[in-house]
Every structure is written in C-alpha cells, then in structure tokens.
C-alpha cells in the first residue's frame, strides 16, 4: 500500500514541500531564515488576531484601548509586546535572508527573487500601518510625514494624499483604513510566501558554493526539519528575552504620549528597521528626489540579476566582492544610525556620503569588482 502522504491530494503538497523535498547537502544556517520568517508571520497573525479582539480603531479610544490591553486583559501585555517585538525579529530575519540572497547569488532565481522583493515592500507597508495604530505621538506624526511624501508626485500628489487620508489631515478615517489594511495584508503576505515557495521548488535551493547540487541531494526531513527546529528555538529564545526583559528597548518613548496634532515631537523618526531608508530620504534636499531615492533604495534589489557580471554565482570564492559586500553591510548600519539622529552637522554630511556609497556599491563598484575577478582567473 502506498503511503497516504504520497497519495492524498493535500498531504502530497506538504510532503513534496517539507518531507521528501530534495535539498542540497551543504546548505548552511543562512538557509534557516526562510522557515524563521514563516514562524514570525504565523506569530504575528496570531498575536495580531488576539490584539484586534480588544483594539478599537477610533482616534478617541485607540490609545486607551492599547492601555486597556496592557493593563486589564489577561496576558495582554505579553501579546502586545510579542507583536511589537515580533515585528523587529521579523525584520532582522528579513534583512539576513535578503543579505544571504545577495551574498550567495540566490537572486539568479528571477521569479523567486522578484516575489521576495514584492514581499519586502508588502511587509514594510504592513509594519508602517501597524505602527500608526496605537495612536501615540510618533504614530500620528510618523503617519503624517510618510503619507505626506506622496504629495511630491507631480499633478496628482496633493489629491492622492488627501484620498489616502480620507480628509484634510491624518484623522479617524485614516486610522480606520490603516487598521483594515493592517489586518488584511498579512494574509496577502502569506499567499505571496506560498507563491515564493512554489517558484523556489521549481528550481530547488541554491547552496553556498553557487554550483549545481543535483548530484548530491538529501531529503528535507529529517535533516533540515531538525535544523529548522534548532533555528526556531534560537529565535524564540531571542524574542522571549527581548519581550520579558526589555520590551521597550526598540520602541520610541514618544509613543507613550497620546497623539496630539498641536504638538510636534522634536525628532520624528520611524521604527529602527526603516531608519536606513529614512536616512537616504533625508540626505537629498529635494522632496521628489528624496522620495525617489527612498523607493529606489529597496527597488534596487530587483536590479540585482541584471547587475550580476561575475562568471561565478556565489561570492564564496570572490574576495574583492566579499569586501565590498561587508562594506555595504557596514554602510547600512551607518545609515540606520544616521536615520535616528537629528538633522544637523555632522550627521547631514555623513548621511549624504553613506547614501552615495550605498548606491555606488550596488550599481557601480560591485559589478566592476566582479568583472575584475573574472579577469584574475583563467576561464
């Protein structure tokens, strides 16, 4: 009798994706982040669902409903902080996942990569709208500043902003629609992640060497299921430590002040995971130029397959490209730091230099280094 997991229409899909899937024998812990992102998404949907049971999306009661969750709901504080810090863990895993893709040339799987870039945009949009919901000072002013960027679009900009706001300023209509979008988007993300996986399984996983692993595959279960469980335990340990010991470490104290349209905070800044893009936005004095740079700072990832000039897929055996890659990582850390600083000397200049370096590395220096490395070897 054939095993039910190989014949049942539903079980067959699960079996071919997580049990009998042929996987390269040499993929390292950098390949754990896909499963960790799946765990993060499930955690966010579950905690978000329980928060939505007690949250009210009205400007008069939103802030106090979050306070009510933390004070009066059984383990409400835990659910709220798991959700807030779960978002941070989500982005840490996302950045590491994308970094892995850049380092090992995973972007050569075009469909998988492009859906990944779309997923990144969707997750960023979801996180931004979620940050608005507690209706604290930083929620309100963050929403005002970021949505206002659309007014830089010629001709339709102002109308577009007022259409998104549902009025002439960020108000009740804005909060209600942001809550609606914030609720629906994670399910769209889950569907996109399914398509992401579908395209990945068409080609099979990449591996650290960047060479074909068709001659040396092993079954996903038990080898990589046990490895993913270890990764999940490390993630849960890190998240638990953050939530239980310093839940407000990554948050902004200003968000504990109820939103007040008449009082602007001294430094408006988004959550830490958007600071690198925010620094790039601020480094350009022109409004439209800044918005374009902001969008392109993420969209540039979609160009990676076109910018690949090396004859090798992975950076594993390319020392010059490795140096430039880690320079890019350092540059992103500098941009993150600058994004959280006030707009004054010397931070303005550092931000501008770091922004120039960011685009130069990706668009010019790394492709040139790859060409140089091609000439260093006899092919």
Curated annotation (Swiss-Prot):
Lineage: Eukaryota, Metazoa, Chordata, Craniata, Vertebrata
An annotated GO BP: mitochondrial electron transport, ubiquinol to cytochrome c
Binding site for heme b b566: 97, 196
Bridged cysteine pairs (disulfide): none
Cofactor dependence: heme b
Gene Ontology CC: mitochondrial inner membrane; respiratory chain complex III
Co-factor note (free text): Binds 2 heme b groups non-covalently.
Bilayer topology: Multi-pass membrane protein
Gene behind this protein: MT-CYB
Family: Belongs to the cytochrome b family.
Keyword Heme (UniProt): yes
Positions annotated to bind heme b b562: 83, 182
Protein name: Cytochrome b
GO molecular-function terms, A-Z: metal ion binding; ubiquinol-cytochrome-c reductase activity
Organism: Mogera tokudae (Sado mole)
């Amino acid at each position: 009798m054939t095993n039910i997991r190989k014949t049942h229409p539903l079980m067959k899909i699960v079996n071919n994706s997580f049990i009998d899937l042929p996987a390269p024998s040499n993929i390292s812990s950098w390949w754990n982040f896909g499963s960790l992102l799946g765990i993060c998404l499930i955690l966010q949907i579950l905690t978000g669902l329980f928060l939505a049971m007690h949250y009210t999306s009205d400007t008069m009661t939103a802030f106090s409903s979050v306070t009510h969750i933390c004070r009066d709901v059984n383990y409400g504080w835990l659910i709220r902080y798991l959700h807030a810090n779960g978002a941070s863990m989500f982005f840490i895993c996302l950045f590491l996942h994308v970094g892995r893709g850049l380092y090992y040339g995973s972007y050569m799987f075009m469909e998988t990569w492009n859906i990944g870039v779309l997923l990144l945009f969707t997750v960023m949009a979801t996180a931004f709208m979620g940050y608005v919901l507690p209706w604290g000072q930083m929620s309100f002013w963050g929403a005002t500043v970021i949505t206002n960027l659309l007014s830089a679009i010629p001709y339709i900009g102002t109308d577009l902003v007022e259409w998104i706001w549902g009025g002439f300023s960020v108000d009740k209509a804005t909060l209600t629609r942001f809550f609606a979008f914030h609720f629906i988007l994670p399910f769209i993300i889950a569907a996109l992640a399914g398509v992401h996986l579908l395209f990945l399984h068409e080609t099979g996983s990449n591996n650290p060497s960047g060479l074909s692993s068709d001659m040396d595959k092993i079954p996903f279960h038990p080898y990589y299921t046990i490895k993913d469980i270890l990764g999940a335990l490390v993630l849960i340990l890190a998240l638990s430590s953050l939530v239980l010991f310093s839940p407000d470490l990554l948050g902004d104290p200003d968000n504990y002040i109820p939103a007040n349209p008449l009082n602007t905070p001294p430094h408006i800044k988004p959550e830490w995971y958007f600071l690198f893009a925010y620094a790039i936005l601020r480094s350009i004095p022109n409004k439209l130029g800044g918005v374009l740079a902001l969008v392109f700072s993420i969209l540039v990832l979609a160009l990676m397959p076109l910018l690949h000039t090396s004859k090798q897929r992975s950076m594993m055996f390319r020392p010059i490209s490795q140096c430039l890659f880690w320079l890019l990582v350092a540059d992103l850390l500098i941009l993150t730091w600058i994004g959280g600083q006030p707009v004054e000397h010397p931070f303005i200049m550092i931000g501008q230099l770091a922004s120039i370096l960011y685009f130069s590395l990706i668009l010019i220096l790394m492709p040139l280094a790859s060409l140089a490395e091609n000439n260093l070897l006899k092919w």
